[in-house]
A protein has these predicted regions:
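C-terminal motif of bacterial Sec signal peptides marking the signal peptidase cleavage site
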Residues: 18-21
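Alpha-helical transmembrane segments
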Residues: 12-16
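Alpha-helical segments in soluble extracytoplasmic regions
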Residues: 36-125, 133-157
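Bacterial N-terminal signal peptides that target proteins for export
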Residues: 1-10
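Enrichment for repetitive, rod-forming helical segments
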Residues: 10-11, 116
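Extracellular mucin-like PTS domains
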Residues: 29-33
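Bacterial signal peptide processing site
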Residues: 23-26
Length: 158
């Protein structure tokens, strides 16, 4: 597994930790703010960028804590990082993007992106070896394709 992938894995996990600590008070008087597509993309890309950075940090910490040689990790070590760091982190990113609320008229597209990301994250947790396979489509291909078509610049990048 490359350092970049491990880094990406670590960043997603860190987002999950940070987001879990964030709460909001809801007194029932708040009104929902509907983002424009441009605002949605900007905020979504910020979530993905921060997530990638945190995935990198978390993957590096995980590798250090478990004495994983990031230059020559075994397949089992790679799978452990993918299922333990990347999958949960990507699920958290999906949750955060979903929480932004879809721009008017873009509900189906944004729901499809989130659903594809959730599906990919679940597959990575359940069968991390799919990310390491060099043939066929990967568990994140659909989410990446949909995110790119929607206009994301950070989300949907490998």
């Amino acid at each position: 597994m490359s350092k970049r992938l491990i880094a990406t894995l670590a960043g997603a996990m860190a987002i999950a930790i940070v987001a879990a600590g964030c709460g909001s008070s809801d007194d029932g008087t708040e009104t929902a703010v509907v983002l424009t597509k441009t605002e949605f993309i900007a905020q979504g890309d910020a979530i993905c960028k921060k997530g990638s950075e945190q995935i990198e940090d978390e993957a590096n910490a995980f590798a250090e804590e478990n004495d994983i040689d990031t230059n020559k990790p075994t397949k089992e070590e790679q799978e452990e990082v993918i299922s333990g760091v990347l999958g949960p982190a990507l699920q958290k990113q999906a949750d955060e993007i979903s929480a932004l609320g879809a721009p008017d008229g873009e509900e189906e597209k944004t729901e499809a992106i989130v659903a594809a990301l959730e599906s990919g994250a679940e597959e990575l947790e359940d069968d991390p070896g799919t990310l390491l396979e060099e043939s066929g489509t990967g568990p994140l291909d659909k989410a990446n394709e949909l995110a790119n078509k929607f206009g994301f610049k950070e989300c949907g990048q490998e």
